From Swiss-Prot:
Keyword DNA repair among record annotations: yes
Protein name: DNA replication and repair protein RecF
Biological process terms in GO annotation: DNA replication; DNA synthesis involved in DNA repair; double-strand break repair; SOS response
Keywords associated with the record: ATP-binding, Cytoplasm, DNA damage, DNA repair, DNA replication, DNA-binding, Nucleotide-binding, SOS response
Family assignment from sequence similarity: Belongs to the RecF family.
Gene that this sequence comes from: recF
Length: 364
């Protein structure tokens, strides 16, 4: 899929912009504060139903305006069909209002399922060395887009977990807790299996990509932590054993909501010793592997939005990353404050835009 038109009204520094990106590589150059990141933020907002920079009250609506509007047209192409799609989001101070293909939508998840965007922004490097919730969210994004029933499964587990935690806080009778334990274990085992299988698929992509971009790290696997000792006992037994502790804590201390995954390297003891640049490269390769898996399952590529791609990367690694991106038929939106040396060989296969004072101008 690729965006053919992006319309912004009263969004951040943009008053009124109609922009037409090209398929393939799109470079956006401009000074700090010119609106480059805001442009990618708008695309991200359409694909995730939320901003990666804050809430509406944090300045999404242009100063002096009462509302914002974002519209996007894109071409959707799988192995069989091609069709044009259109979506819009507006906010008038109370709530988001979304439309998809001319129809009002009740839930933003409907829009998110239609437009697949993979974003790398300033905090994305935390995927590798921060809390496990980000890594679970990474797996769940991929499953949400390639397995139609995954959202229902995830919602079911979240609901049952909430009910069990409520019972633990209220010190409810044992019979009620056992019933919820049974349901939690049934759904939790399914959720865990989906995540594990998905990570196994990604592993086949991630290891060659990381080996190519930074061979000195000698990656040899992605380790999955189920959230309990699954190799020793099923979830229902683990919940029974932890029941007294859970009563004491007032919450469920193990299960898929405690799962995690980490890259394993032969040359270093763990991800905690990676430099910021290395962490950025590893994260980028994980995202690219996810995009490739999306193509394998859906027959089309998601949109890649990469903010400040060249920062913290030397010229050699800039070149390697761009080489990989140029090899795939995905639409890629890349921002930077200047034209990095590593990008220059790829201008012939992409388009360059200048962003300044809320305006976007094509350079070549």
């Amino acid at each position: 899929m690729h965006i053919t038109q992006l319309v912004l009204r009263h969004f951040r520094c943009f008053d009124a912009v109609d922009f037409f990106p090209l398929p393939g590589l799109n470079f956006f150059i401009g000074e700090n504060g010119s609106g480059k990141t805001s442009l990618l933020e708008a695309v991200h907002l359409m694909g995730y139903g939320r901003s990666f920079r804050g809430r509406v009250r944090d300045g999404l609506i242009r100063h002096g305006s009462e509302n914002l509007e974002i519209f996007v047209d894109w071409q959707e192409t799988d192995l069989i069909n091609a069709r044009r799609r259109r979506a819009g989001l507006s906010h008038y101070g109370q709530e988001w209002i979304g439309r998809l293909d001319g129809q009002k939508i009740m839930h933003l998840a409907t829009l998110c399922a239609a437009l697949a965007v993979i974003t790398f922004e300033s905090s994305s490097y935390q995927l590798i060395n921060s809390n496990a919730e980000l890594r679970r969210r990474f797996l769940d994004w991929g499953l949400f887009h390639v397995e139609p029933d995954f959202l229902d499964l995830w919602r079911c587990y979240t609901h049952v977990l909430k009910q069990r935690n409520s019972l633990l806080k209220q010190k409810e009778e044992l019979a009620m807790l056992e019933a919820w334990d049974q349901k939690l274990s049934e759904v939790g085992e399914q959720l865990t299996f989906r995540r594990f299988q998905y990570l196994e698929r990604l592993k086949q992509r991630v290891i060659p990509l990381i080996s190519r971009i930074t061979p000195n790290l000698k990656i040899h696997g992605l380790n999955f932590n189920h959230g309990w000792r699954r190799h020793e006992l099923p979830l229902i037994d683990a919940l029974f054993i932890s029941r007294e502790r859970d009563y004491q804590y007032g919450y469920t201390s193990l299960g898929p909501h405690r799962s995690d995954w980490t890259p394993q390297f032969a040359s270093i003891p763990g991800v905690h010793v990676l430099s910021r640049g290395q962490g950025k490269l590893i994260t980028l390769m994980c995202l690219l592997a996810q995009a490739q898996d999306f193509f394998d399952q859906r027959g089309e590529w998601p949109i890649l939005a990469l903010d400040d791609l060249a920062s913290e990367l030397d010229q050699k690694h800039q070149w390697r990353v761009l080489e990989m991106l140029a090899e795939i038929p995905a639409q890629v939106l890349i921002t930077g404050t200047e034209i990095p040396q590593g990008l220059k060989p790829y201008f012939s296969v992409g388009a360059m835009f200048h962003v300044e004072h809320g305006a976007i101008t094509r350079m070549f």
